């Protein structure tokens, strides 16, 4: 028989840098999960990813206090900022442009995000990423 699910915990944790301090500790501690066990497993799974990149993770906590987790790809905004070489997006994206990004870079980001996005094809996913870039104040160049 399948285990009974007690809770789902959604967090964004820096790749390879999970530790028991907030936000990981309190979120998992409330559910009675072994925090160090999660941190070791998460860090092992994300050691191939660039350290410090925020990785969304969905942790399924079962009634017997065991857990499983699924990692997602980094948020599109983080990948766009990294590709454009900027610290943060524009506060006024329609007026102040903060950087430029090429269509090839957008397609590369869409390929990275393809596993988590529900778009029909890579072109649709690229357009979605392009919209995110524009809302951050990035200029898309052909």
UniProtKB/Swiss-Prot annotation:
N,N,N-trimethylalanine PTM sites in chain numbering: 2
GO cellular component, one term: cytosol
Taxonomic superkingdom: Bacteria
GO biological process, alphabetically ordered: cytoplasmic translation; ribosomal large subunit assembly; stringent response; translation; translational termination
Alphabetized CDD domains for the sequence: Ribosomal_L11
GO molecular function, a single term: large ribosomal subunit rRNA binding
Modified-residue entries (N6-succinyllysine), positions: 72, 81
Signal peptide as annotated in the record: none
Annotated Gene3D superfamilies: Ribosomal protein L11, C-terminal domain (1.10.10.250), Ribosomal protein L11/L12, N-terminal domain (3.30.1550.10)
In-chain residues carrying the UniProt-annotated modification N6,N6,N6-trimethyllysine: 4, 40
SUPFAM superfamilies: Ribosomal L11/L12e N-terminal domain, Ribosomal protein L11, C-terminal domain
Function: Forms part of the ribosomal stalk which helps the ribosome interact with GTP-bound translation factors.
Family designation: Belongs to the universal ribosomal protein uL11 family.
Protein name, as recorded: Large ribosomal subunit protein uL11
Biological source species: Escherichia coli (strain K12)
The encoding gene: rplK
């Amino acid at each position: 028989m399948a285990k009974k699910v007690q809770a789902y915990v959604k967090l964004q944790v820096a790749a390879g840098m999970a530790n028991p301090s907030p936000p990981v500790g309190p979120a998992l501690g409330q559910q009675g999960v072994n925090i160090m066990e999660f941190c070791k497993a998460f860090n092992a799974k994300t050691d191939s990813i660039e350290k410090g990149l925020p990785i969304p993770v969905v942790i399924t906590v079962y009634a017997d206090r065991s857990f499983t987790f699924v990692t997602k790809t980094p948020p599109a905004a983080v990948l766009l900022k990294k590709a454009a070489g900027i610290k943060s997006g524009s506060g006024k994206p329609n007026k102040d442009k903060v950087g430029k990004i090429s269509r090839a870079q957008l397609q590369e980001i869409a390929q990275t995000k393809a596993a988590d996005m529900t778009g029909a094809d890579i072109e649709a996913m690229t357009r979605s990423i392009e919209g995110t870039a524009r809302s951050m104040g990035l200029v898309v160049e052909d």
